[in-house]
Amino acid sequence: MPKPINVRVTTMDAELEFAVQPNTTGKQLFDQVVKTIGLREVWYFGLQYVDNKGFPTWLKLDKKVSAQEVRKENPVQFKFRAKFYPEDVSEELIQDITQKLFFLQVKEGILSDEIYCPPETAVLLGSYAVQAKFGDYSKEAHKAGYLSSERLIPQRVMDQHKLSRDQWEDRIQVWHAEHRGMLKDSAMLEYLKIAQDLEMYGINYFEIKNKKGTDLWLGVDALGLNIYEKNDKLTPKIGFPWSEIRNISFNDKKFVIKPIDKKAPDFVFYAPRLRINKRILQLCMGNHELYMRRRKPDTIEVQQMKAQAREEKHQKQLERQQLESEKKRREAVEQEKEQMLREKEELMMRLQDYEQKTKKAEKELSDQIQRALQLEDERKRAQEESERLEADRVAALRAKEELERQAADQIKSQEQLAAELAEYTAKIALLEEARRRKESEVEEWQHRAREAQDDLVKTKEELHLVMTAPPPPPPPMYEPVSYHVQEHLHEEGAESLGYSAELSSEGILDDRHEEKRITEAEKNERVQRQLLTLSNELSQARDENKRTHNDIIHNENLRQGRDKYKTLRQIRQGNTKQRIDEFEAM
């Protein structure tokens, strides 16, 4: 029994391990991977490995895994990656898993600076990536520092601005909050819709030379072949759509492209190594097939996948609406509960206020009663004193009468009697004056007693009003309410140095509609506004001395009003012959 081969396949978010037989083909391994992760849009993807010479290579599906130039290691390492890119992610990507894999791969390309991304776009994309991971921003769930372990923006962008890590996180948190209500899957798609407008998105670059020996870049992507000057990967100079190409072939390092326009000469360039020409041919065949397929009616399989995706999306929207409804209901109940608690606290405060007022009124009443009793005691004492003085006056009158009678009856010493009489007369006058004063005091005390009695009656009436007022209402009781791209090469022999592929363009509709496209920022006012705001914010912290060569090129393109699609229209102008002549002259 042959010993199985241990294989480790790393996707963008998982590691898968398999044991395969020595006769297992690339397709069998590939099918096992896509089945495991539930992927049906298999035509975009491939298995990549580093060959014995250290070059990244795509696993051939029609050959045995063990017969290819994989390193003899245990386990054998593969990466599951997107090999071909869609023209428009929002129109072509069907499954959520497909969107997620593209999102993670493109994000990694931007963060590692393999795909140039300007600063303001990098921050906006970072906020969408945060939304895709964390969902809606919440002050309770997302405390300060919740982004501290996240890779958010390219290191190049951070180095170019005088902002701390915390300041970058604060900016992204603000934009994260702006995306409230957006589903995680939708955030990934919004990320890709913006990222696909970046100049280097989805392009495979290869070093080539024209017949003059000029060093150039060949860019192979979903739309065709583009030629770049050696010092500028952002701005293609010449473009050939796939619909203009009928045959691609190479012999050793010489690569020949035959246009559909038979009046045009062959498009010839040279690659430094044979294996590069093989990769170019494979990518050309795969991209051309997908380009043609997109311009034909969908197959039954794709129609079924789209119908299923629509149904799943509709179901998710319903679930989202139900969750939102339930969330709003819970929030309403919480608000109602908080309102009742506030009302209860207000009632308790009012009751305490009533109690304090009642106690104060009772104390005032008690004080007034005490004061009234004191006044009554003083009035009684004054009354008794007045009565005593009256008795003394009466006794004095009687004594006077007695003396007068004695004076009449007895004849004694006239002077002595007169002196006694004068003495008693003076005493009577004094007593009379004292009696009048006491009577006046009695009247005053009686007046004050009446006032106290009136205050007492008034206080009793106020207390009675407080005690008989209806109590505040009690707080209410709370009731908690597939198919693969045909990209393998038909070889004449194992050591053959020449390969050729015919590219058919029959039966396609609107073969160059991509030239009518505009960027997401141009058609989406919200994205346009966000990018403008971010650009203004970051310009104040930018260190102009740290601008890279790509920054300078990008800014110059912006200044001249160019973007990815305007450039595409420009580089395809003229007939095929004119553009080939232009390439030869570079």
Curated annotation (Swiss-Prot):
Q: What is the lineage of its organism?
A: Eukaryota, Metazoa, Chordata, Craniata, Vertebrata
List all Basic and acidic residues biased stretches: 308-340
User: Positions modified as N6-acetyllysine?
Assistant: 60
As stated in the Swiss-Prot or TrEMBL entry, residues carrying the post-translational modification Phosphotyrosine are: 146, 354, 478
Bilayer topology: Peripheral membrane protein
Question: Among its keywords, does the record have Glycoprotein?
Answer: no
Q: Which SMART domains match?
A: B41, FERM_C
User: What about PTM?
Assistant: Phosphorylated by tyrosine-protein kinases. Phosphorylation by ROCK2 suppresses the head-to-tail association of the N-terminal and C-terminal halves resulting in an opened conformation which is capable of actin and membrane-binding. S-nitrosylation is induced by interferon-gamma and oxidatively-modified low-densitity lipoprotein (LDL(ox)) possibly implicating the iNOS-S100A8/9 transnitrosylase complex.
Tell me the ranges covered by the FERM domain, including all copies: 2-295
Any idea which GO molecular function terms this record carries? actin filament binding; cell adhesion molecule binding
| PROSITE patterns in the cross-refs | FERM_1, FERM_2, FERM_3
Quaternary structure (record)? Interacts with PALS1. Found in a complex with EZR, PODXL and NHERF2. Interacts with MCC, PLEKHG6, PODXL, SCYL3/PACE1, NHERF1, NHERF2 and TMEM8B. Interacts (when phosphorylated) with FES/FPS. Interacts with dimeric S100P, the interaction may be activating through unmasking of F-actin binding sites. Identified in complexes that contain VIM, EZR, AHNAK, BFSP1, BFSP2, ANK2, PLEC, PRX and spectrin. Detected in a complex composed of at least EZR, AHNAK, PPL and PRX. Interacts with PDPN (via cytoplasmic domain); activates RHOA and promotes epithelial-mesenchymal transition.
For the motif [IL]-x-C-x-x-[DE] motif, give the residue ranges: 115-120
Stretches for region Interaction with SCYL3: 244-586
- Where does the record place the modification Phosphoserine? 366, 535
Subcellular location field: Apical cell membrane; Cell projection; Cell projection, Microvillus membrane; Cell projection, Ruffle membrane
| Residue runs in coiled coils | 302-462
Q: Any idea which UniProt keywords this protein has?
A: Acetylation, Cell membrane, Cell projection, Cell shape, Coiled coil, Cytoplasm, Cytoskeleton, Membrane, Phosphoprotein, S-nitrosylation
Reading the lineage from the top rank, the first entry is Eukaryota
Under which name does UniProt file this protein?
A: Ezrin
The ranges of region (Disordered) come to 305-340
Domain comment from the record reads as follows: Has three main structural domains: an N-terminal FERM domain, a central alpha-helical domain and a C-terminal actin-binding domain.
User: Which residues in this protein are found as Phosphothreonine?
Assistant: 567
Per the UniProt entry, what species is this protein from, by scientific name? Oryctolagus cuniculus
